[in-house]
Amino acid sequence: MPNYIFWPYESLFENSAAQGPQVALAISFEKTHFVVLGVCEPQYLEEVSIRPPYSVVATKNNGAEGWNYKVADPCNVHFRIPKLKFMQFYSSDPISLIIPEKEVGLHSSVGETLNYSKLEQHPRYKRDNKKLSETLNIINLFPAYCKALNELYPFIQTSQENLRGTMLNSVAAWCSSTCIYKMVAKIGFYLTFVICSIASLVSSLLNYSHFQLVNYSAFVQQIDLRCQQICYFPVQYERINKKDNIQNVGSMVEKDNSNSQFSHSYMPSKFYPDYILLYNTIWLIINDISFGLILGAILIENRDFLVSASHRVLKFFLYDSLKTITETLANNPLGIKLNAELANFLSELFLWVIEFSYTTFIKRLIDPKTLSSLLTLTIYMMFLVGFSFAVSLAIDFFAILSFPIYVFYRISSKLYHCQLNIMASLFNLFCGKKRNVLRNRIDHNYFQLDQLLLGTLLFIILVFLTPTVMAFYMSYTVLRMLTITIEIFSEAVIALINHFPLFALLLRLKDPKRLPGGISIELKTTVSNKHTTLELQNNPIKFKSMFRPYNLLLSQMRTNYFSFATVRKIVRGESIMVNRNKLYYVLYSSLPSKPLSVKDLYKRLTIQA
């Protein structure tokens, strides 16, 4: 089995012009490969003993082009040093833009996750992949290990530009020690705690166990989302600003020079997803308010036209069209002969509901003065808190106005569903069968003649009444699906505003190394080389992985509302509901499942301060 030696390009280029003999010094632990940290001249090592985990892996004679390796069957792997300052790092697995506790819930199948976990624990997979992962951890902390080596052996040339003290760092350290800075930090601490406490209290009230308002209102859910984001900001900031990770590497190497398990817990890249999620959320909030300012200005200029047009459209859709459809259903629509008595009864019932709802609240809500006041409120809301709040308020307003359609759909679907169940039971009776509820099966049964006659008469009556009930049911089902489509489309717009991976896309275009999607190792051996040479490269994350929550959201929408299962529900008369909480759960992937309490929040802020 070859011994892999990871060489940084910077070290190769810095020492390629040197003519004298050289010695390459590397670090390696029990579960890692060799990683070259620097080179020096041999005379510096004559009076110094190199202690583990450091060792000499190669030497170079005076004027020689190649290296003489001290290990058997060496294999060189060249890599470029990741810049910790710019949050570049290597990762064998694609970086996750989702909180780990939400990963299992977003998988299409929990069984797939369990199978992958079992495969990951296989000895062969664990042996090969673990060694490479631990080596990548050393590479990611390469400047820190170089600093630790340079402090122990100052004569060794290492590449540690990222850790050299600068004047800016000195000025920042001096400013942080002044009284003014401490006073401002104290004020910021208490101000942050008060804001987060209010947000946490509001979120707790909206998610009260006995009556969760977030399940019934899009506007309330938007408030809850923003409150949870505000509460989670300090936690994300505290995670991404830990500076003890790099500084303690040298002491940890001295304490435990045979094991590298500590390196994973000291990896700064562990919290890079929080960095991306934090600034992505901040950018989206700023863009949300920007869109609100732009669209609010447009709405102000066209307010009179929008009010009059909205009044006409809403009156036609919620009153005139409903009344026309209901009256048409009572008069044999499309030449289909319906049961006159049942059609007139249902038509008069629905017409009474239409008139009652219109005179009670719809007429007042769609009045031009009311619409003008509501539009003004929406515009001010756009200016203050963003476009998403205005859209969510419009969704709730539309849901209130379309409540009569929901009532008609529920009544007709219940009638249709009950009629189908009764007809199925009577058909079993006609065939001499009976449903066994305990065993959930159809058994043969003997019925009396009068039972068969009565069942047959009822079955025939229901068969002749089915076209009438179906006509009302299908008409209001179409209207209900139209309202659901409008609500879902508006919810998708809100989801796009709140959770679009804008910051991640910009990072992907600007610096793909900050969003690793795995690694690739390519062969670089030339004819003059005696040993195999490989090149370690960072593969950027795929765009498909960045939009994975949206793919799951679209899949849920298609499955629940626009699939064969939806058609089957309509045929059976089952209710089609908008489960906003289940639909929107996918897009809460950047937030913890349980909102932070005030006590936990205070602990986080205290640690950060």
From Swiss-Prot:
GO biological process terms, semicolon-separated: fungal-type cell wall organization; GPI anchor biosynthetic process
Membrane topology: Multi-pass membrane protein
Family per record: Belongs to the PIGQ family.
Uppermost EC category: transferase
Stated name of the protein: Phosphatidylinositol N-acetylglucosaminyltransferase subunit GPI1
Keyword list, A-Z: Glycosyltransferase, GPI-anchor biosynthesis, Membrane, Transferase, Transmembrane, Transmembrane helix
Gene from which the chain derives: GPI1
Keyword Transmembrane part of the UniProt annotation: yes
Pathway it works in: Glycolipid biosynthesis; glycosylphosphatidylinositol-anchor biosynthesis
Record text on subunit structure and interactions: Component of the phosphatidylinositol N-acetylglucosaminyltransferase (GPI-GlcNAc transferase) complex composed of at least GPI1, GPI2, GPI3, GPI15, GPI19 and ERI1.
InterPro entries given in the database record: PigQ/GPI1
